[in-house]
Protein backbone atom coordinates (compact mmCIF):
# COMPACT_ATOMS: atom_id res chain seq x y z
CA UNK A 1 0.00 0.00 0.00
CA UNK A 2 1.04 3.63 -0.41
CA UNK A 3 3.79 4.66 2.01
CA UNK A 4 4.58 1.11 3.08
CA UNK A 5 8.05 -0.34 2.52
CA UNK A 6 7.06 -3.80 3.71
CA UNK A 7 4.03 -5.89 4.66
CA UNK A 8 2.87 -5.10 8.19
CA UNK A 9 0.83 -8.29 8.41
CA UNK A 10 3.65 -10.48 9.71
CA UNK A 11 5.02 -9.21 13.04
CA UNK A 12 7.54 -12.07 13.03
CA UNK A 13 9.34 -10.69 9.95
CA UNK A 14 12.75 -9.56 11.28
CA UNK A 15 13.23 -7.14 8.37
CA UNK A 16 10.00 -5.16 8.80
CA UNK A 17 8.79 -2.98 11.66
CA UNK A 18 5.17 -4.16 11.98
CA UNK A 19 4.14 -0.94 13.73
CA UNK A 20 5.33 1.41 10.97
CA UNK A 21 5.39 -0.84 7.87
CA UNK A 22 8.94 0.40 7.25
CA UNK A 23 12.09 -1.64 6.81
CA UNK A 24 14.16 -1.97 9.97
CA UNK A 25 17.46 -0.03 10.06
CA UNK A 26 20.04 -1.71 7.82
CA UNK A 27 17.46 -3.84 5.97
CA UNK A 28 17.31 -3.59 2.18
CA UNK A 29 14.25 -5.82 1.78
CA UNK A 30 11.72 -7.83 3.74
CA UNK A 31 10.59 -10.44 1.22
CA UNK A 32 11.06 -11.62 -2.34
CA UNK A 33 12.89 -14.33 -4.21
CA UNK A 34 16.07 -12.22 -4.17
CA UNK A 35 15.86 -11.21 -0.49
CA UNK A 36 17.85 -13.22 2.03
CA UNK A 37 18.16 -12.18 5.67
CA UNK A 38 16.98 -8.63 4.89
CA UNK A 39 19.60 -8.12 2.15
CA UNK A 40 19.45 -8.26 -1.64
CA UNK A 41 20.99 -11.46 -2.95
CA UNK A 42 24.15 -11.14 -5.03
CA UNK A 43 23.81 -10.37 -8.73
CA UNK A 44 23.80 -13.57 -10.75
CA UNK A 45 22.14 -15.72 -8.06
CA UNK A 46 19.56 -18.00 -9.71
CA UNK A 47 16.09 -17.09 -8.41
CA UNK A 48 13.99 -19.13 -10.85
CA UNK A 49 15.19 -22.33 -12.46
CA UNK A 50 14.45 -22.94 -16.12
CA UNK A 51 11.80 -25.46 -17.15
CA UNK A 52 11.49 -26.91 -20.62
CA UNK A 53 12.53 -24.35 -23.24
CA UNK A 54 12.71 -21.63 -20.59
CA UNK A 55 15.95 -20.08 -19.26
CA UNK A 56 17.03 -19.35 -15.66
CA UNK A 57 16.16 -16.01 -14.06
CA UNK A 58 18.80 -14.27 -11.93
CA UNK A 59 18.82 -11.72 -9.12
CA UNK A 60 20.20 -8.33 -10.16
CA UNK A 61 21.69 -7.37 -6.78
CA UNK A 62 19.62 -4.18 -6.48
CA UNK A 63 16.08 -5.45 -5.84
CA UNK A 64 14.26 -8.21 -3.97
CA UNK A 65 12.20 -9.30 -6.97
CA UNK A 66 13.26 -11.94 -9.45
CA UNK A 67 13.46 -10.15 -12.82
CA UNK A 68 12.52 -12.18 -15.88
CA UNK A 69 15.40 -13.01 -18.13
CA UNK A 70 14.99 -10.93 -21.31
CA UNK A 71 15.76 -14.02 -23.40
CA UNK A 72 12.46 -15.77 -22.50
UniProtKB/Swiss-Prot annotation:
Chief localisation class: secreted
Gene Ontology cellular-component annotations: extracellular region
Domain Disintegrin: 1-72
Cellular localisation: Secreted
Organism: Cerrophidion sasai
Disulfide bridge partners, by residue number: 6-21, 8-16, 15-38, 29-35, 34-59, 47-66
Name of the protein this chain belongs to: Disintegrin sasaimin
Entry comment describing in which tissues the protein is expressed: Expressed by the venom gland.
GO molecular function, one term: toxin activity
Keyword terms of this UniProt record: Cell adhesion impairing toxin, Disulfide bond, Hemostasis impairing toxin, Platelet aggregation inhibiting toxin, Secreted, Toxin
A Pfam family recorded for this sequence: Disintegrin
Family classification: Belongs to the venom metalloproteinase (M12B) family. P-II subfamily. P-IIa sub-subfamily.
Entry-linked InterPro entries: Disintegrin_dom, Disintegrin_dom_sf
Keyword Secreted in annotation: yes
GO biological process, one term: venom-mediated suppression of platelet aggregation
Top-rank taxon: Eukaryota
Subunit structure and binding partners: Monomer.
Tagged with keyword Disulfide bond: yes
Function, in words: Inhibits ADP- (IC(50)=66 nM) and collagen-induced (IC(50)=100 nM) aggregation of human platelets. In vitro, inhibits adhesion of endothelial cells to vitronectin, type-I collagen and, to a lower degree, fibronectin and laminin.
Miscellaneous information on this protein: The disintegrin belongs to the medium disintegrin subfamily.
Short sequence motif named Cell attachment site, residue ranges: 51-53
